[in-house]
Amino acid sequence: MAAKFHLCLLLIILGTITVQGARHPGKPHFFRRQPGSDCASINGRCVPPNERCPNGECHLQSCPGYQEKCCCPV
């Protein structure tokens, strides 16, 4: 009886972890907002220069890292 209970509890925990991972796919870590910048004021995102901007690059020089560019908002 205890083995069935432990197995059931394990399945519930694994199911919860799986659902939590599926619920938060999120954006890649390199997409981030920089509060107070011109890029953030237009809802853009600062990304490393080697990453592709899905909607094109907004040519703003306000990303704090000198090696970052601003991606236009969706």
Curated annotation (Swiss-Prot):
MF GO annotations: toxin activity
Major site of localization recorded for this protein: secreted
Location in or out of the cell: Secreted; Nematocyst
Signal peptide (from-to): 1-21
UniProt KW keywords: Cleavage on pair of basic residues, Disulfide bond, Nematocyst, Neurotoxin, Secreted, Signal, Toxin
Record's GO cellular component terms: extracellular region; nematocyst
Propeptide: 22-31
Cysteine disulfide partners in this protein: none
Processing and modification events after translation: Contains 4 disulfide bonds.
Record carries keyword Disulfide bond: yes
Function: Induces neurotoxic symptoms on zebrafish. Has also been claimed to be implied in calcification, but tests on homolog proteins suggest that proteins of this family have a neurotoxic function and not a calcification function.
Family from the record: Belongs to the Cnidaria small cysteine-rich protein (SCRiP) family. beta subfamily.
Protein name: Small cysteine-rich protein 8
Native organism: Orbicella faveolata (Mountainous star coral)
